[in-house]
């Protein structure tokens, strides 16, 4: 955080960096009485004192100072004051989908910077998808040689080497961001199956969907497929220090499993009810493998739509499909005492534009006011159930959302979501919040972020989301 302070705060002022044992103009003090990730900034006539209980708190103090000095290039005067600030939730996350569309490393860093600036502490990196496998796995080179280039779109070829990923992890660590990798299983596996068809139920070549997903998922009946996935997780765990590994689990159609002799045999051998129970069994095998490595497994809420084979106690559920299933996954997860991350697609999926575009019909649009006033995830957190860890928001790259389109989908709506993740007190009325957003717009644009329309009525007929 001191490097961040020098780069983002002192560089805008005439202050010179010099460590002193006493009489410093800016003092950094560890104060264990402050909440985790909380901080206090006290401004005296001759001195600024910054206190925090941990690295996260100091990092967020720097991010606050960064906004205070925004636009300044010379001397700055602060009024004497005291500010104490701390987060509402322990899980504040941004998801970036690099599976469907590959982004340059500079782009990944840009959105890690953004997450830290908005006082988030997790970056959920969606690295595997039907349209692309983006993480180098040394034991299985064809995952990236073949699976990294199956897409035909503008930005659908490419992958990240393990060395590049290590650099990104360190870049995030310096900004108090933990990167949570997602290796999606058993569904959204077409890119992997294009490289290794034997991992599917019938061992046949697979077609790569231009969007959505197909019946081609990892076979849960083959021991070889389970060994493959565990070997992949070995390399993922060696690479990522995160205590959490996301294993996907969403949108896994069971048509092939229902016809597959290996899957039918597995259901009989394990005493399972059906293919839905088989997915629970499969998920439990993967979660238990992560447990043996001291990690927790996150699954999308689809895995708890049906009761059945129990998941282990290192399981976390991410509730997402509010549009299709309302709060079913949230309720079932809480019933089984699984911790929950709230990311209801209404209104945290920021690939949903403000107005219709391509496959996003009017029913899949929302604006800043919708987010601020009607977010089901915000309302769930307000219930203060200790099982609810916090909130995540997402930028999926369905329908060809390329790098140049990302900012205008995120901003300004992500500012409402970051406010809900962090702020515990009474919310401002929307009009006042919107005025604050407009006041801060120039600074975010100076920091390199492009704003899109905030409200539906702001969107002109000729506005181009792409």
Model-assigned labels for residue ranges:
Residues 1-89, 405, 421-455, 463:
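Contiguous, structured surface segment used for ligand recognition
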Residues 15, 120, 177, 295, ...:
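Short glycine/serine/threonine/alanine-rich loop segments
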Residues 4, 110, 160-167, 224-231, ...:
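Generic recognition of stable, solvent-exposed alpha-helical segments in well-folded globular domains
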């Amino acid at each position: 955080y001191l490097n961040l302070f020098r780069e983002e705060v002192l560089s805008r002022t005439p202050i010179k960096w010099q460590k002193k044992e006493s009489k410093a103009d800016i003092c950094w003090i560890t104060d264990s009485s402050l909440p985790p990730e909380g901080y206090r900034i006290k401004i005296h006539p001759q001195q600024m004192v910054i206190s925090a209980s941990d690295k996260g708190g100091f990092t967020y103090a720097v991010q606050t100072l960064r906004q205070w000095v925004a636009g300044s290039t010379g001397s700055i005067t602060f009024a004497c004051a005291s500010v104490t600030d701390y987060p509402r939730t322990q899980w504040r996350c941004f998801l970036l989908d690099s599976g469907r569309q590959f982004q340059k490393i500079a782009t990944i860093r840009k959105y890690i910077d953004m997450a830290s600036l908005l006082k988030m502490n997790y970056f959920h990196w969606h690295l595997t998808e039907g349209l692309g496998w983006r993480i180098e796995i040394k034991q299985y080179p064809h995952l990236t040689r073949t699976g990294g280039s199956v897409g035909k779109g503008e930005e659908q070829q490419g992958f990240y080497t393990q060395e590049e990923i290590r650099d990104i992890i360190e870049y995030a660590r310096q900004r108090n961001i933990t990167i949570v990798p997602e290796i999606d299983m058993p569904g959204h596996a077409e890119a992997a199956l294009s490289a290794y068809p034997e991992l599917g139920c019938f061992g046949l070549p697979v077609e790569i969907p231009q969007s959505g997903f197909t019946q081609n998922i990892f076979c849960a009946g083959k021991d070889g497929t389970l060994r493959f996935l565990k070997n992949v997780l070995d390399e993922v765990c060696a690479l990522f220090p995160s205590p959490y590994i996301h294993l996907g689990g969403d949108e896994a159609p069971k048509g092939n499993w229902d016809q597959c002799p290996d899957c039918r045999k597995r259901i009989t051998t394990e005493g399972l009810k059906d293919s839905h129970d088989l997915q629970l069994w499969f998920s439990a095998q993967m979660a238990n493998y992560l447990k043996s490595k001291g990690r927790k497994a996150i699954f999308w809420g689809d895995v708890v739509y049906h009761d059945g084979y129990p998941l282990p106690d290192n399981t976390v559920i991410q509730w997402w499909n509010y549009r299709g299933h309302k709060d079913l996954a949230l309720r079932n997860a809480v019933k089984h005492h699984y911790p929950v991350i709230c990311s209801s697609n209404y209104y945290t999926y920021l690939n949903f534009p403000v107005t219709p575009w391509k496959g996003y019909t009017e029913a899949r649009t929302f604006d800043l006011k919708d987010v601020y006033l009607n977010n089901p995830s915000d309302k769930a957190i307000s219930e203060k159930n200790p099982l609810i860890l916090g909130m995540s928001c997402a930028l999926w790259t369905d329908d060809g959302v390329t790098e140049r389109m990302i900012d205008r989908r995120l901003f300004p709506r992500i500012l409402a979501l970051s406010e809900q993740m962090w702020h515990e007190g009474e919310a401002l009325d929307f009009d006042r919040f919107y005025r604050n957003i407009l006041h801060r717009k120039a600074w975010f644009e100076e920091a390199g972020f492009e704003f899109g329309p905030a409200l539906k009525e702001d969107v002109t007929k000729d506005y181009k989301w792409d």
